[in-house]
């Protein structure tokens, strides 16, 4: 198996689920280093937030941080960096129904499309569950990084 970098597939924001979605709810941080009740915690996946009718991708995201609207873009902020009055996204859903969309099916490989169609019945996989295929892909990715002069950081 030779590794091929997956392509990013942006959501189709013309779909009804996105066009009909409300704007994300923004609530001011009550004080420094504190998020309001019901704040949205970011994940490992790309996340979009609907603000003033437009979907914004949170860049430089990280898990378990807080999305803050700065008037132009979504910034992903660690709790220790929240400032009193920051406009923080609140909401607990990830399906666009609260103006928050977690794009967990965004990396597309040709062989995955074939597998997805063939094994559609195997959908009982959580985000935190690893499978043998995951380890095989990790091995191929590490080989690819070594061959192309990449830089691997193990955390």
Model-assigned labels for residue ranges:
Residues 1-155:
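Metallocofactor- and cofactor-centric catalytic cores in central/energy metabolism, strongly enriched
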